[in-house]
Amino acid sequence: MELKLEQQEIWENIWLMNERMITIIPRGLLHLAGKSYINGFKKKAAMHAERQLKKELHPYDWQIAYREVSDNTFEIDITECGLKKLAHDFDADGLLPGICRMDYMVSYLMGNGFERTKTLGDGDDCCNCRYHREGLCAWSPEKGFEGRR
């Protein structure tokens, strides 16, 4: 990358910067915000899928398949990623999949459950995201991301 940093170092700086911004908010408020965020995200994902069928999305938007599993859980398969397209157009492909891993940190800090085994940033065919309003999510980059991309 242009800054002459190793890819892992870039990702770790991105994670640290975002973690510091997010943790300014007290933990109790973060957990409350997490529930609200997931509820809103669930509604927006369903509407996004409808807009997608009508071809009303910006070229840098996400292409998704949305599935409601239960009141607590929903899944989104992302088949086209706006961030990946943008990173590519600005010759910043090396930011991925490091930025993809942010989902784990944000879910962990907000007290939501999150799982994923594939990402477009890792070269997979989709990002297979599973969100839980109530649940656990580990943020442990030191353990690596094999099996939880």
Where are these regions (language model features)?
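Amphipathic interaction/junction segments at domain boundaries or subunit interfaces
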Residues: 1-90
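Short terminal or interdomain "cap/linker" segment that borders an active site or interface and mediates
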Residues: 61, 65-96, 104-149
